[in-house]
């Protein structure tokens, strides 16, 4: 029997969109304190949309935080949601009368005053920028664009904020200014979830001399910048479902320099990096890059549950590992960046556990295997069928005896293939050595053009000698 599976129609690849969390164990105040600015408000709104028990509390906190900004439109939207949530709570059949259930009234005086303040500040910043342009002072113009971008961001106008931050690029006079511009653009692009833009500006920042030319020990400021860039790149790779790349990015973050509350917290780095690594790393990579990583261990100390899951997985204690994963699933579904990937990551982690369990054996008793994974034999058989169809395990199932058999590999053919590949590699190296010897014997030197010099002129310093060799 042959089964064709269309990867685009595979439910495991579909993002988790329609879900409701009824039993959260999240400390909302502690959670919100880990973030700042728009990210704090966005995350609280995400929790309110998907967790009825925390909806009113999350919206009240978001309403309080948004009043510290100029974002009047978001204030009105959150207030509307809070009023609806409160009415639903009061009309619930099992509702208990409580004091303080009524939402605070819409503060129209604050709305009008804030709108006027925002408009006055915008006019002042715009006038200042015009004056700077009239004086043709690059540094002042750059700061003027940044100030305008900050103001638009505070007002919730992300498109104009992005334009202002991007315009500052033409007035950057040092690598430090370019990096600052890139970080501003990256931050707004994350809010807009424009992930290709995020990766583009991460690459631009990493290619500046201040970052690219440093080797060995980096100073504290450079480490802080690199950590921000790696965290932003990790979010972009996670959104693109490139989990292995995302894990590598998060693993490169420095714990002592992880201070980016506008986007994510150190706890997020531990959870995102840990789960992506579990889903994609093999046993050796997990041991080398996660368990033995002195830097990432510090992140894992903030999330003991994730740390224990990784160690249980590495120790092949799959039942307890998968049980702990299920226990923290509700909280993960309340994370706005991780939630769409929870089901896929969990499936990949479980599949990797099945592969790791079976890899040393020629055959395995499915009854014992089901006990090890805390599941039924029938459910395990369905899982193994899917894993075999995807080509993750080269095996066959004896449904009558409930035994999983590894398919025999033709060792003779494999040895011949390896020998041929090795011969081709030796041949390539021998040709390269002969070419190098010929170049040295004939004293041929290829000089690169100098970094600084007149363009378009051919001088002896940047002329090149070439030799074509027909091997």
From Swiss-Prot:
Q: Where is the composition biased (Polar residues)?
A: 456-471
State the tissue distribution.
Answer: Widely expressed. Highly expressed in testis.
GO CC terms: COP9 signalosome; cytoplasm; nucleus
Alphabetized, the UniProt keywords read: Cytoplasm, Nucleus, Phosphoprotein, Signalosome
Q: Does the keyword Aminoacyl-tRNA synthetase apply?
A: no
The principal location of this protein is cytoplasm
Residues that the record marks as modified (Phosphoserine) are 448, 454, 463
Kindly list the places in or outside the cell where this protein is found, as annotated in its UniProt entry.
Cytoplasm; Nucleus
Residue limits of the PCI domain? 249-411
What SUPFAM superfamilies does its record include?
Winged helix' DNA-binding domain
Ranges for region Disordered: 445-471
Task: Tell me the superkingdom of the source.
Answer: Eukaryota
> Among the record's GO biological process terms, what is one?
protein deneddylation
Q: Which PANTHER family match?
A: 26S PROTESOME SUBUNIT 6, COP9 SIGNALOSOME COMPLEX SUBUNIT 1
The similarity comment for this entry is:
Belongs to the CSN1 family.
**Primary role:** Essential component of the COP9 signalosome complex (CSN), a complex involved in various cellular and developmental processes. The CSN complex is an essential regulator of the ubiquitin (Ubl) conjugation pathway by mediating the deneddylation of the cullin subunits of SCF-type E3 ligase complexes, leading to decrease the Ubl ligase activity of SCF-type complexes such as SCF, CSA or DDB2. The complex is also involved in phosphorylation of p53/TP53, c-jun/JUN, IkappaBalpha/NFKBIA, ITPK1 and IRF8/ICSBP, possibly via its association with CK2 and PKD kinases.
Description of its domains:
The PCI domain is necessary and sufficient for the interactions with other CSN subunits of the complex. Mediates the interaction with CAPN8.
> Under what name is this protein listed?
COP9 signalosome complex subunit 1
Q: Which organism is it from?
A: Rattus norvegicus
């Amino acid at each position: 029997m042959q089964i064709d599976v269309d990867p685009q129609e595979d439910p495991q690849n579909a993002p988790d969109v329609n879900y409701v969390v009824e039993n959260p164990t999240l400390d909302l105040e502690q959670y919100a304190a880990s973030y700042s600015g728009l990210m704090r408000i966005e995350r609280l709104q995400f929790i309110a949309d998907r967790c009825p028990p925390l909806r009113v509390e999350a919206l009240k906190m978001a309403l309080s935080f948004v009043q510290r900004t100029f974002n009047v439109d978001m204030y009105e939207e959150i207030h509307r949601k809070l009023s609806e949530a409160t009415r639903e709570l009061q009309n619930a059949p099992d509702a208990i009368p409580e004091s303080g259930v009524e939402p605070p009234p819409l503060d129209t005086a604050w709305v009008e005053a804030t709108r006027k303040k925002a408009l006055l500040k915008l006019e002042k910043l715009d006038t200042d920028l015009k004056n700077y342009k009239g004086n043709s002072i690059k540094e002042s113009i750059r700061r003027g664009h940044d100030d305008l971008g900050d103001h638009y961001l505070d007002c919730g106008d992300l498109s104009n904020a992005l334009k202002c931050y991007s315009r500052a690029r033409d007035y950057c006079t040092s690598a430090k200014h370019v990096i600052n511009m890139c970080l501003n653009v990256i931050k707004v692009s994350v809010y807009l979830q424009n992930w290709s833009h995020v990766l583009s500006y991460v690459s631009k920042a990493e290619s500046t001399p201040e970052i690219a030319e440093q080797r060995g020990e980096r100073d504290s400021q450079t480490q802080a910048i690199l950590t921000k860039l790696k965290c932003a790149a990790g979010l972009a790779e996670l959104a693109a479902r490139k989990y292995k790349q995302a894990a590598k990015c998060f693993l490169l973050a420095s714990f002592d320099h992880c201070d980016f509350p506008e986007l994510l917290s150190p706890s997020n780095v531990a959870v995102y990096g840990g789960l992506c690594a579990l889903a994609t790393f093999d046993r050796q990579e997990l041991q080398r890059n996660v368990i033995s990583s002195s830097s990432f261990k510090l992140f894992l100390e903030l999330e003991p549950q994730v740390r224990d899951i990784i160690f249980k997985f590495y120790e092949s204690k799959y039942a307890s590992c998968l049980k702990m994963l299920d226990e923290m699933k509700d909280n993960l579904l309340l994370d706005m960046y991780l939630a769409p990937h929870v089901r896929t990551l969990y499936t990949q982690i479980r599949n990797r556990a099945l592969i790791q369990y079976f890899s040393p054996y020629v055959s395995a008793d499915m009854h014992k295997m089901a006990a090890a994974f805390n599941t039924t034999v029938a459910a395990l058989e369905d899982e193994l069928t899917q894993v075999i169809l995807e080509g993750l395990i080269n095996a066959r199932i004896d449904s009558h005896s409930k035994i999983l058999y590894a398919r025999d590999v033709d060792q003779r053919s494999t040895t011949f293939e390896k020998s041929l590949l090795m011969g081709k590699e030796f041949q390539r190296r021998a040709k390269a050595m002969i070419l190098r010897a010929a170049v040295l014997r004939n004293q041929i030197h290829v000089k690169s053009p100098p970094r600084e010099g007149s363009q378009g002129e051919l001088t002896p310093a940047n002329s090149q000698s070439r030799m074509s060799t027909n091997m």
